Amino acid sequence: MKALSKLKAEKGIWLVDAPKPVMGHNDLLIKIKKTAICGTDMHIYNWDEWSQKTIPVPMVVGHEYVGEVVDIGQEVRGFKIGDRVSGEGHITCGHCRNCRAGRTHLCRNTSGVGVNREGSFAEYLVIPAFNAFKIPDDISDDLASIFDPFGNAVHTALSFDLVGEDVLITGAGPIGIMAAAVCRHVGARHVVITDVNEYRLELARKMGATRAVNVSKESLKDVMKELGMTEGFDVGLEMSGVPSAFHAMLDTMNHGGKVAMLGIPGGEMAIDWSKVIFKGLVIKGIYGREMFETWYKMASLIQSGLDISPIITHHFKIDDFQQGFDAMGSGQSGKVILSWD
């Protein structure tokens, strides 16, 4: 089968002929229709320090996808051949304390599809049936293929009550932009998103952000004054991993504010903890998606009218994968879809 593999311990990704994955008794065999390129895939493509420590070579990568069930393990119940599915990319152990308590997204033994095991940049993928999510008929393949990052946005945004609240999002990558759309959809008052990438900020405006602020040109505090905000942001969503962005968030949070952190800093990050203490801030770390509450909320948000389609800016056939990675790496894109049909 065709697959995109991290074939060598160097920058790049390669289109190869790979063996079809072998299915176990509790697994589904999925014929991939569309995949999306994630920021994690770009780290692997660029072969950065994290990738060098984490990714076995060679390995098929990728973890954002939609496909069709074409075979079912003999112990599987609840799925049938022809079901259209996406899937949770975090494979959990099922026996640690968090798994047994229903907090599977916090499993300490998590294995990542396309990170620790064969991924979805291939004509076929095998995953445990437990991890598969049936896609409703009224949700397109394009949207289903980005459910993984959309889930990060939903999990982060819905960590705290948003109705009537003022929200600051630092980092206008695709996940931050989708989080802005979620916040507006569920009833936040002002949703302000910051970045220095004007292309991405314009996407955020299209997706409903109240203000998309280029912090290299405009002061966040000036924007707050323009919006009539006198007390600070009630909710902060840190999506960038950039220390200066998080510092700006701490400076502008209201007393009693709540912060959800998804962005991963490149190294240790010092902050002024007195601001956290004296403002009484709550900080919550976010990893992945809640299984499977986030997935049902994703589908329901789209079915209730949330439109995240503007975040998808590029489509390529799999044979043109290099153009897709180039587009994603340029910073002048939203989500990039690769078609396997």
Curated annotation (Swiss-Prot):
It is an enzyme of class 1 (oxidoreductase). Its EC number is 1.1.1.103. It catalyses: L-threonine + NAD(+) = (2S)-2-amino-3-oxobutanoate + NADH + H(+). NCBIfam families: PRK05396.1 (NF003808), tdh (TIGR00692). Its cofactor is Zn(2+). Belongs to the zinc-containing alcohol dehydrogenase family. Zn(2+) 2 binds at residues 93, 96, 99, 107. It is found in: Cytoplasm. This is L-threonine 3-dehydrogenase. InterPro entries: ADH-like_C, ADH-like_N, ADH_Zn_CS, GroES-like_sf, L-Threonine_3-DHase, NAD(P)-bd_dom_sf, PKS_ER, Zn_alcohol_dh. It comes from the Bacteria. Binds 2 Zn(2+) ions per subunit. One of its GO terms (cellular component) is cytoplasm. Its main location: cytoplasm. Pathway: Amino-acid degradation; L-threonine degradation via oxydo-reductase pathway; glycine from L-threonine: step 1/2. The active site is at 40 (charge relay system), 43 (charge relay system). GO terms for molecular function: L-threonine 3-dehydrogenase activity; zinc ion binding. NAD(+) binds at residues 175, 195, 200, 262-264, 286-287. GO terms for biological process: L-threonine catabolic process to glycine. The record marks 148 as: Important for catalytic activity for the proton relay mechanism but does not participate directly in the coordination of zinc atom. Coiled coil: none annotated. Keywords: Cytoplasm, Metal-binding, NAD, Oxidoreductase, Zinc. Homotetramer. Zn(2+) 1 binds at residues 38, 63-64. It comes from Shewanella baltica (strain OS155 / ATCC BAA-1091). Catalyzes the NAD(+)-dependent oxidation of L-threonine to 2-amino-3-ketobutyrate. The gene is tdh.
